[in-house]
Amino acid sequence: MVSRLQLTVEVTVKLLMLRTATGEVNLSEFLVETRLAGFDGIEGPIPANPAARKELRQQLQDNGLVLIAESTTGSDLTASDWWIPRPERTVPDHLEDLRLVAERAVEVGALFVNTMCGRDSWAWSEQVDFFGEALELEQQIGIPISFETHRSRSLFNPWITRDLLQIFPTMQITCDFSHWCVVCERLLDSEWPILELCAQRTLHVQCRVGYAQHAQVSDPRAPEFQEALLAHERWWDLIWQSQLQRGFSQVTMTPEFLHDGYMQLLPYTGAPVADVWEINCWMAQRQRQRFVQQYSAG
């Protein structure tokens, strides 16, 4: 049984550990399990139905949990590969998808919006148009928007991310470095100046561990993946240091080991080679301990 994440040492900045949500059927059971496992909230999509949004907000309050709203723009949410942006969806389409989620995020009291947005194949002018308009939308609606580093999306590699951050000084990002490890086919220490820039603009971290051939190691506890785990932790430390320097009163992190093609399966049987929930709880506990050790007030 996974133990509760119990750490009582006071820290100068609070680390909120979020559980990833993927549209669970029984919201009440999911949130109770989340709370009992020691997580501070969830990161996931917001229901389109107004009554369901009202229920979500109430149940989050009842359980003392926070929410990061997930936006996936330009996709077909009914498709099996719902996370992939469709080629026929235009910049205005992506912006409209983002606007809808941002408005709903305000309604349910989310901390901010995390968005997988844009498309990797867009021309540079389309990328610039999208992010310029998205940042204006952020100001209009009045909720922070954090743009996620993700394959198939605008921020699919370190270099385009660097270039966009240099153009848009108020742009904040969600760093999921596991995707870049696959795109670049290596760990990212060779791109340290870009990692430093990203750290200075990071609002949120998704702490999955990737490596050169896959966006998710099968089990970060295994010794064969220690190099990749320690590399990601170096990069997350860089982000934490920047967030403290920028005066954050709380920082957020989501362990995001997933199924949906991320978790390796045994041939023929299709059985997962490790337990995703167990790994996410282990990762949450490990990162919370590391955070307290580095930033304790005592």
Q: What is each of the regions a protein language model found here?
A:
Residues 1-100, 106, 281-298:
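N-terminal pre-domain/capping segments
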Residues 57-76, 131-142, 167-168, 233-237, ...:
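Alpha-helix-loop-beta-strand connector modules within alpha/beta enzyme cores
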